[in-house]
Swiss-Prot record:
The keyword Iron does not apply. This is Regulatory protein ViaA. Homodimer. Interacts with RavA. The gene is viaA. PANTHER family: PROTEIN VIAA. NCBIfam families: PRK10997.1. It is found in: Cytoplasm. The lineage of its organism: Bacteria, Pseudomonadati, Pseudomonadota, Gammaproteobacteria, Enterobacterales. It comes from the Bacteria. Component of the RavA-ViaA chaperone complex, which may act on the membrane to optimize the function of some of the respiratory chains. ViaA stimulates the ATPase activity of RavA. Belongs to the ViaA family. InterPro entries: Uncharacterised_CoxE, Uncharacterised_ViaA, VWF_A, vWFA_dom_sf.
Length: 483
């Protein structure tokens, strides 16, 4: 069976303009406009998806099959082009019968054209084929538009689902444009509303515990380089780009009258296939009165200013991935569990903003792993937040898992974060020795987030930094009173 791509090539129909028109119409839809106004950070992330959308639409048009009736008509047209005028006159009754049988839009016009001329001349032969081809072009264009409309509805439905998900999670997980882009990429998974509401719930809990959120941000960015500007610096030229309006065709701004065929409205194109309106279409084309999409865009202009030269002495330190180990023993249940999960969510937020990896390991009697910064990060985060802290405490296994992962090439600059109340047995000497070696030779940093004031000093002595967040009732009341 004939493919739509082959038909477009045969009739010289360009689908590129229709694809671009559909993309522009999609971007101009009220749903996306409102979404971009509400979540401006996600606009760039959605825009970055446009090449993938275009490729998917082209692939859909390329693989689509042409209906059998249209295929037969196209084949008949192709064969008729090879006939001379005398041969064509002989085959004309069969051609008219075929057009009638196929219910071709050109059937009535072809019959009228033959009956209104007693003599079938070569010029009439040429006119017959030209109008037949025009009818086929209109049919092919209509078929392309029908398929694109179906794809637009499906694409809009998918985008709306992802917008709902991203919009719900943006306040919790998207700190900057980079995080918004990664969050949009993660939203491509199959998630239900009830699933990601768990992240929203812990995001609200984190917002109600500003000290916990601040602690996570301090820990996550504790490796930031320190810079000291020098004084009495000379002036230097500083160039910046300033945005200003332009006429670059970037997004739909309305409707105008012109002769731009590529941006023609579908109702205008439909008049081309109606015999009574055909000459009216060409008249309006010549007079530039066809209704088309009006586009506008933005341009950048270079602005030159003078400012003092600022040199900075920077002690750069690498900012690698997080390996977070969470104690899921029974003593970490209740409010401790909520704080530990919310703290991991805050670290995930930092990782997304700084383009870092965030790997979670739960330790009790066994080690369970989740990667919150991968393509399936949202699903992994939901699984992690769904866990219950009811196991035992095997902190030695946790450290062995950290050591084993840090020895891999991809994790050579990772930071380890252990979240626990540190009410556990002392660590074996071989584990303590290996941790010290990683700290000394490879500059790995080990952070402890202590959820209790009663953690054993012997365990916590091996950490580079100890971040305390006491979850006792007295400390909770004091924090609430200070707010």
């Amino acid at each position: 069976m004939l493919t739509l791509d082959t038909l477009n090539v045969m009739l010289a129909v360009s689908e590129e303009g229709m694809v671009e028109e559909m993309i522009l119409a999609l971007l101009a839809s009220p749903q996306l406009v409102i979404f971009f106004e509400k979540f401006p950070r996600l606009k760039n992330a959605v825009t970055a998806d446009l090449p993938r959308w275009r490729e998917a639409l082209r692939s859909r048009l390329k693989d689509a099959r042409v209906p059998q009736k249209l295929t037969e008509e196209v084949m008949c047209y192709q064969q008729s082009q090879l006939l001379s005028t005398p041969q064509f006159i002989v085959q004309l009754p069969q051609i008219l019968a075929l057009l009638h049988r196929l219910h071709s839009p050109y059937a009535a016009q072809a019959k009228q054209l033959v009956e209104s001329n007693s003599t079938f001349t070569p010029s009439l032969h040429t006119l017959f084929l030209q109008r037949w081809r025009l009818s086929l072009v209109v049919q092919a264009t209509t078929l392309n538009q029908q398929l694109l409309e179906e794809e637009r509805e499906q694409l809009l439905s998918d985008v709306q689902e992802r917008m709902t998900l991203s919009g719900q999670l943006e306040p919790t997980l998207a700190e900057n444009d980079n995080a918004a882009g990664r969050l949009w990429d993660m939203s491509a998974g199959q998630l239900k509303r009830g699933d990601y509401q768990l992240i929203v719930k812990y995001g609200e809990f984190l917002a109600a515990q500003p000290e916990l959120k601040q602690l996570a941000e301090q820990l996550g960015r504790s490796r930031e380089a320190k810079s000291v500007p020098k004084k009495d610096a000379p002036m230097e030229t500083f160039r910046t780009l300033v945005r200003e309006p332009a006429t670059v065709p970037e997004q739909v701004d309305g409707i105008q009258q012109s002769d731009d065929i590529l941006r023609l409205l579908p109702p205008e194109l439909a008049t081309l296939g109606i015999t009574e309106l055909e000459y009216e279409f060409y008249r309006r084309l010549v007079e530039k009165q066809l209704l088309t999409y009006r586009l506008h865009g933005e341009a950048w202009r270079e602005k030159v200013t003078e400012r003092p030269v600022v040199h900075q002495d920077v002690d750069k330190q690498p900012r690698g991935p997080f390996i977070v180990c969470v104690d899921t023993s029974g003593s970490m249940g209740g409010f401790n569990e909520q704080c530990a999960k919310a703290f991991c969510l805050a670290l995930m937020r930092v990782a997304l903003a700084d383009n870092r990896r965030c790997f979670i390991m739960l330790f009790s009697t066994e080690v369970v792993r989740y990667e919150l910064s991968g393509p399936e990060g949202i699903e992994q985060a939901i699984r992690f937040l769904s866990q219950r802290f009811r196991g035992g405490t095997d902190i030695a296994s946790c450290f062995r898992a950290i050591i084993e992962r840090m020895q891999r090439r991809k994790w050579f600059d990772a930071d380890a974060v252990v979240i626990s109340d540190f009410i556990a047995q002392r660590l074996p000497d071989d584990v303590v020795s290996k941790v010290g070696e990683l700290q000394r030779l490879h500059q790995h940093r080990f952070h402890a987030v202590a959820m209790s004031a009663h953690g054993k000093p012997g365990i916590m002595r091996i950490f580079d930094h100890i971040w305390r967040f006491d979850t006792g009732m007295r400390s909770r009341l004091l924090r609430r009173w200070r707010r």
